[in-house]
UniProtKB/Swiss-Prot annotation:
Disulfide bonds join C51-C67, C148-C219, C180-C198, C209-C233. The active site is at H66, D115, S213. Belongs to the peptidase S1 family. Granzyme subfamily. InterPro entries: Peptidase_S1_PA (IPR009003), Peptidase_S1_PA_chymotrypsin (IPR043504), Peptidase_S1A (IPR001314), Trypsin_dom (IPR001254), TRYPSIN_HIS (IPR018114), TRYPSIN_SER (IPR033116). This is Granzyme K. PROSITE patterns: TRYPSIN_DOM (PS50240), TRYPSIN_HIS (PS00134), TRYPSIN_SER (PS00135). Pfam families: Trypsin. The lineage of its organism: Eukaryota, Metazoa, Chordata, Craniata, Vertebrata. Residues 22-25 form a propeptide. Its EC number is 3.4.21.-. It comes from Mus musculus (Mouse). The gene is Gzmk.
Amino acid sequence: MRFSSWALVSLVAGVYMSSECFHTEIIGGREVQPHSRPFMASIQYRSKHICGGVLIHPQWVLTAAHCYSWFPRGHSPTVVLGAHSLSKNEPMKQTFEIKKFIPFSRLQSGSASHDIMLIKLRTAAELNKNVQLLHLGSKNYLRDGTKCQVTGWGTTKPDLLTASDTLREVTVTIISRKRCNSQSYYNHKPVITKDMICAGDARGQKDSCKGDSGGPLICKGIFHALVSQGYKCGIAKKPGIYTLLTKKYQTWIKSKLAPSRAH
């Protein structure tokens, strides 16, 4: 999902979310074959979907750091793996309490940088055909015009406040940083840094949106980025902004996971 104006406006499960900046849904996409994206995680509060995430280790989920601000203090969200429908009692679902949140760094108000966070599950997931890991890509360079897929339970129309019940996916196109920072696009508000990338659709008909935050951007089968933010949803010159999994972030991730792999 994404938010704009850097304000949280939409109310979901008692948590304010913005319909403009941080994304919660898929615009112009299609429902995926059930359980064909077994790495997807639904981060929920009181059984309501708030953000997406990616299982990268049996006990670790990667997501967007801004998602943390949507959970009231003293109330811990849960992570659901193996889901396709959020509402159905699917036997392959695995639900976990959260042991801790580890953001890359403290998000600054009005900043778009470093929107990445690790979530450690209280217990390890049981890996099977419906729950699998998505490994980090070794390359993070994306050429302008590259076609990529973004997956999530976010809303399917910009004016909706509710998540999609089923997992959806849409193909978006990479937009160069130079163009995304230009006056006709974001005009450096926010600045699209080397740790970020833009992706959207020339007609504004394909996009991530409210609820898709933290989900993966996959290009040619490689996990490149996480859904972060954007201005509203489905606007051609306000494409989705993604946190690129650069070497800096991958080194940080590996350092945090190292103790887990040692056991």
